[in-house]
Amino acid sequence: MATDTSQGELVHPKALPLIVGAQLIHADKLGEKVEDSTMPIRRTVNSTRETPPKSKLAEGEEEKPEPDISSEESVSTVEEQENETPPATSSEAEQPKGEPENEEKEENKSSEETKKDEKDQSKEKEKKVKKTIPSWATLSASQLARAQKQTPMASSPRPKMDAILTEAIKACFQKSGASVVAIRKYIIHKYPSLELERRGYLLKQALKRELNRGVIKQVKGKGASGSFVVVQKSRKTPQKSRNRKNRSSAVDPEPQVKLEDVLPLAFTRLCEPKEASYSLIRKYVSQYYPKLRVDIRPQLLKNALQRAVERGQLEQITGKGASGTFQLKKSGEKPLLGGSLMEYAILSAIAAMNEPKTCSTTALKKYVLENHPGTNSNYQMHLLKKTLQKCEKNGWMEQISGKGFSGTFQLCFPYYPSPGVLFPKKEPDDSRDEDEDEDESSEEDSEDEEPPPKRRLQKKTPAKSPGKAASVKQRGSKPAPKVSAAQRGKARPLPKKAPPKAKTPAKKTRPSSTVIKKPSGGSSKKPATSARKEVKLPGKGKSTMKKSFRVKK
């Protein structure tokens, strides 16, 4: 008992609050158990459960520095703490279980919404990115194949496989028909986007379809080998179709030109400044002006470019000599370059091969109203706006600056028009210049050939003057003996033959000698001189008449 009293006396001042606290904790535990059984929902809301651990921590802190506390009390307090912790942990564990479920649901919803938004954005991008190759684009075979592979949709002018097959059979037709090998080569060369080398089944399917329809007939072989011929249709059906076409064309008005086809030409004409490199100029001139023979004689083009730069008709931006890029100079709206065929070729080459082709909407509006006014100007502007939007969606054009129906646009595909399309009004002038050049060259050739006849005329003209008549007579008398000598040589055999006939008396020989003398050289001289006298008699007569008139006066 002494130990108990001593312990009680020692512990009394500080142990009482601990004991009271332990009792209160037991009461709280009992209350919590009842609440757990009856009202589980309120547990999550109550914040009183979080307070006991703080008091426990404070008590523990107070207990640590006091080594004199009895072992029983310490054991009881430890047991109480252990009993207190599990409900708190269970309640705390239950709280986060409900929260993550709500958080997971919210995260799922947000992720679904973001996915939907991303899908919508991707769809919109796909709609904007979808590109087609326009009919006006000037691309080589390799460029066309690359563009068709890159774009999701094939170019619009490409026909279907059945039409391609009939076209290939007609193109490769021979006496024994068109072979499958020739058809395949033709399609691969002309339509590389089909990739027939890798997808040969397309040709087989098309052959089978056309054979079943009766459009094609197999002349040799079996299956997808051999040769084929296009079956000719009866003559009655095409006549009917022609008549229908004629009627429809007579009734229907002529379709207006689409602005889609007009805009590329407008871009090439309105784009400023116009410049092109020497290689592009040479390529264009050799293609559309074969008469100039630029491939064989490139020095002509180089000299023409250097001459134009010296005159101030062109400006050399880069390079030296005939290399680099050249820019057109203008006086107002008209270019300074022009005149000869070579200069006109350079002008059209720079205007056509200028890249990139850009144009403002104000210039486009002005161009359309001047060249394609239509019935209503407001409606035409509305059509222009719609066509620009359509071209931008298809990927034919790109808006560089501005928004909507303002700013500047740029062509996304190359467009190199021929000189006839680019400057249609200047073609006849060029042809006239060519004709004039040809006429001048022909005149020069004729002048080179004409000088000898002019000398003959110079000899004949002085004979008309009466003062020089004597000199002409002398000249004319000189060649006369030559002619008479030739005639004498011919006339000599006649008198040789005559003597054997003339064996009659001498009386008859005299007249024969006189007769023979007349057709001899003397006779040949007399007609020439007499003719000359007859030609010049009127001249003498005129002179005598003039003298007589003077005498009378």
Curated annotation (Swiss-Prot):
Residues 140-154 have a biased composition (Polar residues). InterPro entries: Histone_H1/H5_H15 (IPR005818), WH-like_DNA-bd_sf (IPR036388), WH_DNA-bd_sf (IPR036390). SUPFAM superfamilies: Winged helix' DNA-binding domain. One of its GO terms (cellular component) is nuclear speck. The modification N-acetylalanine is found at A2. Residues 94-127 have a biased composition (Basic and acidic residues). Residues 517-527 have a biased composition (Low complexity). A central region that included the first H15 (linker histone H1/H5 globular) domain binds at the entry/exit site of the nucleosomal DNA. Component of heterochromatin that maintains heterochromatin integrity during G1/S progression and regulates the duration of G1 phase to critically influence cell proliferative capacity. Mediates chromatin condensation during hypoxia, leading to increased tumor cell viability, radio-resistance, chemo-resistance and self-renewal. This is Heterochromatin protein 1-binding protein 3. It comes from Homo sapiens (Human). The lineage of its organism: Eukaryota, Metazoa, Chordata, Craniata, Vertebrata. The gene is HP1BP3.
